[in-house]
Amino acid sequence: VRVRQRAKAISIAGNNQLLADGAMNNCGIGLGQLAVDMNTLEDAYTYEPEPKSFLYSPTYHVPPMSQRYYLDNKSSFAGLNFLHAFTKSSVLRVNALYYADTTVGEDSVFSRYVADDTVSIFENNRITDSRNTAKMSLAYELNTKKVYLSDRLTGSITWRDAANNNTTNIGKVEEFIYQKPRGLQNILTAELNTPSRLYSLSSVFRLYDNAESLSVVFGGDGSDSRMLKLKSTFMRNRVATVFDLFGNSLTLGYIMEHKHNNVAGTQSGHSSVSGYWIHTAEPMYEINFSGGSAEISLPVEYISCRYSWRDGRTARFMFSPHADASLKIGNLLTADVAVAYNQAADTDNPLTDGVVANNYRTYTKYPDSISVERTSLANLRLSYFDASSMFSCNVYAGWTHVRRDYYMKYLYAGDYTFATPEWHDNSRSSWSLVASLKKIYTRAGLSVDASCSYSYNKALASQNGIEDYLRYNAMNASLTTGWDKLSWINLSVTCAGNVSWKRHDCFSESGDLLKNVYYTVRMDVYPVSNVHAYSDFSQTTFEVSHGHYSTNCFWNAGVIYDVLKSLSLSVSAVNLLDRRVYEEAFYTGVNYQYYRTPLRGREMMVSVRLKF
């Protein structure tokens, strides 16, 4: 039996507002996004990603399709939002939520790692993944003519248990993963508007820790257990002011950033402690002129790092000039140009001086010092829009060249994978061309939206003692048309195709050419004002190997009947063709992967919606 339920209740009384929200389902619709959406209004200065987990499945893959076709889940969500207005300009918000989810994922994966001695690996995974998340936030906001202030304190904790019964090329393997990430974060933003200038302040402070454990049972050959613990402290503070210079805006900003990480449980046998301080001076000048505007940014950074496994500190300066301009060419055409040279330290994830077991077969020696990525880029965008004829066109051309001071070397064997950093200059480059147009024929009720793109990527690959640059090409074209001339029927059709290939290299003499085609048709019918019937059909064809294709077709339909303003009935059917298997193949670098997963099959649901 498939169940999908959701209920909301709203109470408004004087200066108080209360919203209660609850949902649960087991019909392939994950509710995790409801928990993510509680996050705050974060900008470039207050956003910092949480450290990635060390443990992961080596091959588990999420299909590029709607979850309702494949997700075997039991999900529930409960949220409570309270707002109290002290005055017209100041409010207090309290949010709390709890999210629980259990999914069962099955797939079969064949991977081919290309080298002088090509290694082939197969896995039949059955993963049961359970997550429970609790979050709470307290936010205060003040908004007056002279002062804007926002402060939000958020706390969260997640419990995750995952078990994988895996049949592999080395026999039966059972994996058990436990993770418990916890975080406490405060974000403060403020703006002070004075007659002479504008002052702004932003601050983020976060405490984070994660305990992870991995237990592996090899069929008949014993077991292995690992435990990792990460404790991380992060803060970033920025102050800036804006004032007039020669009739334009000059922004002067200063940023101070600090992070401290402690990783315990690697094969080094001791804790890996690392930390850094970054000080940034950030001048930016905006120029407005007849027919356009320009912006010049000249930030200078100083970073100082310390590691427990190394004496002393390492430090360096980084300069990242950036300039862009927007030009109006006539009344219909706009050109946007940007050039930049960015130097950025890779500070997102913790460093270690030991080897970490990521899963039953993958071991990684992570970088033991902060690396710097140097990016040169240039791009041009031309935009044409004619409101009188309802026609628009965009052309984009971009080039990027990235240099890093290390790259990862991979060693693939039948029973393990080992990744280690090689500290040597490493570069990758890409350029792309994209063109799109849209035309609306108002009298005919017809719209046409078309696009095409081409991209070229060059990157270094190193595995099993072979190193070479890979040169990949990809082309894509798509066309979408819609027709809504009649008020009681709407039609839309989308079709797209992709082709990817690479040049000859040391890993392969073939071009690794793969093609796929996709199209979807949707019809919405409104025979009377309170009845809405819909149907959609989609088909995707993947080339899984040279000359061999897999086709996936899906047909869905439904009817919604609004009996009253407060009552509606609906019937929906998903996967009417009862497609049971999804297949695809793709290249990751030089390596080939074939993927197969079971689908949920045909399902129908009757729904009742009440408002009161």
Task: Annotate each language-model stretch with its function.
Residues 65-71, 123-129, 173-179, 224-230, ...:
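Outer-membrane beta-barrel domain signature
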Residues 83-101, 129-310, 321, 328, ...:
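Face-selective signature of the C-terminal outer-membrane beta-barrel domain
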Residues 1, 18-24, 298-306, 366-368, ...:
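Transmembrane beta-strand segments that form the barrel wall of outer-membrane beta-barrel proteins
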Residues 2-5, 72-78, 130-134, 180-184, ...:
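Residues that define the transmembrane beta-barrel architecture of outer-membrane proteins
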Residues 1-160, 175-204, 242-247, 289, ...:
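Membrane-proximal, glycine/serine-rich, low-complexity loop/turn segments characteristic
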Residues 371-377, 398-410, 414-416, 420-436:
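Signature for the C-terminal beta-barrel architecture of outer-membrane proteins
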Residues 22, 31-37, 104-120, 161-170, ...:
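Outer-membrane beta-barrel translocator domains and adjoining extracellular loop/strand segments
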Residues 489-560:
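C-terminal beta-barrel architecture of Gram-negative outer-membrane proteins
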